[in-house]
């Protein structure tokens, strides 16, 4: 399995659910070779066990299975939007305005337009797919998917808030699920439970029939960070304020890791 460093932690290099079990010596080796401060992965748990950590997945989709309210919202999106596959160059040229509007709306940083274009062009070949939603001819939303055999990951979804009233997210998710899950027989995933920021997007996906694939959460640290985590953990409730968001996230993950530790055993 390949690994990469994300936000200071070494994590599996995949967008799809994976459930490795490592021995303590394997963990120490990965930390030493990578230079990361922490190692994070998701061991398996016994079938039928519910945990506070999970992957969001959708193995089956049918429009008629949605609630009446969801069906109405999808219909509104279908009537007001046009969902289409996009060529990489099309998204590179038109997508930055949508990205900028979405990030400004949520108070996030905005990359330079040329940086965005280079990143999209670099993803121009499979396994990447690009989808767009046009409202009155304008690109109001887009998604990036990664397709591998019988599975697909929803990697990116951005919506220009100016088009919220057109229900682009509903039209787009319906089209993606119909194409990949209902007709393509693939399982769609949207990564693991979000712990680093407040979001209701995964709750939105649950309304489309996504489910929770439960697992444990394992965190391993360098000796110095392990000492700091043990020291701060009893006082985690005091980590308040916007500037301490990363600390709260780490303590929340540590809490989950401790609660799921009895449910799995490491490799010998």
Residue ranges and their predicted role:
Residues 1-2, 6, 43-64, 186-268:
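Active-site/acyl-donor-binding loops of N-acyltransferases
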Residues 1-42:
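N-terminal accessory interaction module
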Residues 1-6, 39-48, 57-165, 174, ...:
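A conserved beta-strand-loop-helix scaffold within acyl/acetyltransferase catalytic domains
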Residues 22, 66-68, 171, 196:
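Residue-level recognition of alpha-helix initiation/capping sites
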Residues 25-35, 171-187:
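Conserved acyl-CoA
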Residues 168:
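Secondary-shell segments that build the walls of catalytic and ion/ligand-binding clefts
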């Amino acid at each position: 399995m390949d690994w990469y460093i994300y936000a200071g932690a070494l994590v599996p290099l995949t967008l799809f659910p994976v459930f490795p079990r490592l021995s303590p010596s394997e963990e120490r080796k990965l930390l030493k070779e990578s230079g990361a401060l922490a190692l994070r992965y998701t061991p398996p748990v016994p079938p039928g066990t519910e945990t506070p950590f999970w992957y969001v997945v959708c193995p089956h989709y049918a429009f008629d299975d949605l609630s009446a309210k969801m069906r109405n919202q999808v219909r509104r999106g279908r009537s007001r939007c046009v969902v289409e596959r996009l060529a990489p160059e099309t998204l590179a040229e038109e997508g930055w305005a949508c990205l900028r509007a979405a990030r400004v709306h949520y108070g996030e940083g905005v990359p330079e337009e040329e940086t965005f274009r280079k990143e999209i062009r670099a993803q121009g070949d499979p396994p990447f797919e690009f989808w767009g939603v046009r409202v009155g001819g304008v690109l109001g939303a887009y998604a990036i998917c990664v397709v591998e055999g019988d599975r697909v990951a929803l990697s990116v979804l951005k919506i220009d808030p100016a088009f919220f009233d057109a229900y682009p997210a509903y039209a787009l998710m319906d089209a993606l699920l119909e194409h990949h899950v209902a007709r393509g027989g693939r399982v769609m995933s949207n990564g693991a439970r979000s712990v680093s920021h407040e979001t209701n997007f995964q709750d939105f996906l649950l309304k489309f029939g996504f489910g929770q694939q439960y697992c444990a959460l394992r965190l391993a640290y360098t000796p110095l960070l392990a000492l700091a985590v043990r020291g701060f953990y009893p006082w985690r409730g005091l980590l308040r304020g916007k500037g301490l968001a990363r600390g709260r996230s780490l303590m929340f993950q540590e809490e989950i890791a401790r609660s799921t530790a009895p449910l799995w055993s490491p490799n010998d």
